[in-house]
Design a protein with these regions (language model features):
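Trp/Gly-enriched beta-strand/coil motifs that build multi-repeat beta-propeller-like domains
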Residues: 2-307
């Protein structure tokens, strides 16, 4: 992979910060990115930053926590586009964020300094996993990653501080890699088998209000399931609970954090007609999402990856 990741992150990060200002947050920024074979490029979007540079909101004494990131989308030509939150419950106009992503199979954002803003992204390219920081050259994490058909980071699942990575292999076994905070990963730990029943696995932060990062998974029948996090890498999830059915109307489900800037992680879903819907998080395990709100009328089927 070439050293430049092609991710143009500075402008996107600035726009995300602008959205946060409407929620009385302090803006921050970041630089352009890099990566290695055929070099995907990525830029950080302007995201809304948190108060005092931390991942806590200043509005309440016991402020809610949720990461705030742009939604990145990769089109069929390998171009990457960034959609930061607009501070009004939706997404801002897209901006170009990178190129040469034709060979990227999976991608997911990661926050390594626990400030609530992504610092870069892991990208599975062929049989390699690369980490693309927003402010320096890419890092080759390892080889042999073509055994995985799903790679996603839901946040800090193991309790150590930095974001971790989940990977599902072809036989349906889900594995957890703990993050060192620099893009590198520990050895893998087995989460469990039978995960090939799910078409989508995603998450970005705490969905249930207990301070532990969670995930949701959509099965082939269209049922969405919640896996509450434990914060223990040896057993990172509790038993699943049903969120609801009818999710087979969507061909993509992804979480990048808090879209509506209310301090709670949200979920985005794209239907088969290319419309985009936002499911606002509630922070409650019994009913983790509010009713959907359309935030994109069409055209989202042009993207083969969203992260």
């Amino acid at each position: 992979m070439a050293k430049s990741s092609g991710l143009n992150t500075r402008r996107t990060l600035a726009r995300v910060s602008a959205a946060a200002l409407t929620a009385a947050l302090v803006a921050t920024g970041s630089n352009a990115v890099a990566a290695d074979t055929p070099a995907p490029s990525l830029a950080s979007a302007d995201v809304p930053a948190k108060a005092s540079g931390t991942s806590k909101f200043a509005a309440t004494a016991e402020a809610a926590y949720a990461p705030i990131n742009a939604l990145y989308a990769v089109d069929k030509n390998g171009e990457v586009w960034a959609y930061p939150p607009n501070g009004e419950g939706g997404l801002d106009t897209r901006s170009w964020a990178g190129s040469d992503w034709q060979d990227v199979r999976q991608a997911t954002q990661a926050d390594h300094d626990s400030d609530g803003l992504a610092d870069g992204a892991w990208a599975a390219v062929g049989n390699q996993l690369h980490y693309l920081p927003f402010d320096s050259d890419s890092i080759l994490v390892g080889n042999g990653w073509n055994i995985y058909n799903r790679v996603t980071s839901a946040g800090n699942l193991g309790g150590a501080g930095a974001d971790d990575l989940l990977a599902r292999d072809g036989s349906g076994v889900l594995w957890l890699y703990l993050g060192y905070g620099n893009g590198k990963l520990t050895q893998r730990y087995k989460v469990g088998s039978g995960w090939n029943t799910y078409t989508h696995i995603t998450g970005k932060g705490d969905l249930t209000g207990d301070g532990k990062d969670d995930i949701v998974a959509k099965d082939g029948s269209g049922v969405l399931w919640l896996y509450k996090g434990t914060g223990n890498y040896k057993a990172p999830f509790q038993s699943r609970t049903r969120v609801g059915g009818g999710w087979n109307t969507y061909n993509n489900v992804v979480s990048v954090g808090d879209i509506d800037i209310d301090g709670v992680t949200d979920l985005v879903a794209r239907d088969k007609n290319g419309a985009l819907y936002l499911y606002k998080g509630t922070g409650s395990a019994s009913t983790p999402f509010k009713s959907r709100v359309k935030i994109g009328s069409g055209g989202w089927n042009t993207y083969r990856l969203m992260f």
